[in-house]
Amino acid sequence: MERIYQKYTNENTEIFTYRYFDDTKYHLTNNQENKTLILNESSGYLFEIPTINFEFDYSLSSLRCKYFFDNSVLTTSFENKNPYTDKKEKGWEIYLKEWLIPYLSNDEFLKNNQIEKIIENNHEHDFLNKYERYSFYLHIKEMPENYYPFYCISIIRNKNNYKNFYLFVFKSKTNQIDTFEKICKSFKEIQKRGKALNVQVEYQPIADENWNDETKKYYAKLSNQKSIDWGIFTKSLVSKQDDAFDYISNFYKNEGDFYDKNMEHNFELLPTYMHISWAGKFNYFPKELANEYAKGDGFNKKKVLHFTFQYTASNNTSMVGYTPVFDVLRGKYDEYFRLLAKDLKEYHHPILFRLNNEMNTDWTSYAGIITLLDPDIFIASWKRLYEIFQQEQVDNCIWIFNPIAITTPYSNWGEYLNYYPKGMVHMLGLTAYERGNMKKYHSFAMMYKKLYQKNTPYFVKFPHIISEFGAGCGGEAVYDYEQHKYLFLPVCRNLDKQVNFVNKMFDEIKKYPDYVKNIKAAIWFSANDYANVNNKDYIMNYFCLDEKVAPTISAFKKGFKKVGKKSKK
């Protein structure tokens, strides 16, 4: 770095060094010119910000770095996760259009969410002589004063490198395009030394002091138990206002205890999902059915309600359409949230409350790829609901933060730790699926050991819950990405592998290794995924535990006995 020092330093320069093991960064402040050069040695780049008065956050340095100044936040990241590098330029184009800019560049999406272009998108083929740069300048309309409505986003890539690039996301309370342009034009790659590292800390779960006695006792029991509570998701509960109420009510009346009977196990959890709305109609808390089929408190032999709530108005299907996330920040759902809060509080019994799961993906309406490549929007929208619950004195919700095991888009900026709403979480949710369509079949141990390692040390103090998972037995329509078409295969062809998965899973649970010790509850997702091919629906992922997979149901029955769970009487 000595030569860089010589070029950028003079008698007015002060040097600050940040060092965390092999992670080194330098701040060269020029008091006379009121600017600071940021040398990110461990990630191999530098740039300049037009101030000497700023704060920074390097706690997740391997993923992103943040700088706070002049009513703005600059987030920078070195990106190196493009999986299509064997295709060179074509591979870069696939990654760019599929996993970086599909919504930033989509006029329909912007219009549907009241986001306007400040100026037109810009693609510079010869930026600073050796780079390619994609830039977007956006304004989120009608945002409250305490948020940042102006976004400038640039993707900078050396034209000869199809894997590595740099992402700059600059948000501000006023239009600061000129500032952003100066920052980007000061960018330069430098020799990389050391390694960017996250600060290795153990996040702390803090029990809500406002919880009622029932919830406090349940959380303490769940956190300290050495066994796993179980649930199986089949169909979501609905409110009495819902058109499907009679159908769902009859289903639970006639088939609600199917798994309890056939697996000879008293299931401890009742999982259900609810979206903000569907087809333009609000969804409401299913208090009638929850009171009839749940009401568990961890001690009374009834099922504890596991309630997943998602900011979506389309069941996460119309991705270029409307997402409620921006309106959540605008406060347009505050009244609805207060009604939800009152309903949940009135229910009284403990609720495992999972908000906006699988945010680190490209298929949810609140994913970072949709929220302008800025995970902070997810955190802000989480905080909005959390604070309303606090104001309404909700005293029975145990909040679950539940990313998916493998982040997609493959990226650093979109990794799950960037979404963590610190201080507003009581449990860590886990989700890793084996879809069961390929020759290679991942075991429970393979998936959840890896996930345990990924979550260590950050979440070792948290009780963990597998809020949804499954192992498929083989769907009938499987997409082949090499041939770019669906293959039609025998359904349930991998049933023997599914049975083996369940058998080995209970073997692991009985052994009680470190990666299992924090898992306090688990929910099998007993519903199939479908693909529409030529206007016909085919099962794509077969997770449903029905009569076709009787050997798997039998394996669960044997497994519960193996680990000593009480049988249905």
Residue ranges and their predicted role:
Residues M1-S72, Y162, Y166-E202:
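N-terminal targeting sequences that direct proteins away from the cytosol to non-cytosolic compartments
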Residues I52-K159, F165:
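Conserved polar/disulfide-associated segments of primarily extracytoplasmic proteins
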Residues L197-K253, P463-K569:
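Substrate-binding cleft of secreted/luminal carbohydrate-active enzymes
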Residues I248-Y259, Y284-K295, F337-L340, A405-Y420, ...:
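Alpha-helical scaffolding within the catalytic cores
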Residues W278-I398, P490-R493:
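Substrate-binding cleft of extracellular glycoside hydrolase catalytic domains
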Residues N283-Q310, G423-M427, Y433-Y479:
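Glycoside hydrolase catalytic-domain groove-lining segments
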Residues W382-W413, K461-G475, I519-A527:
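Aromatic-lined carbohydrate-recognition surfaces of secreted/lumenal glycan-active proteins
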Residues I404-T431, E476-E482:
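Substrate-binding cleft/loops of secretory-pathway carbohydrate-active enzymes
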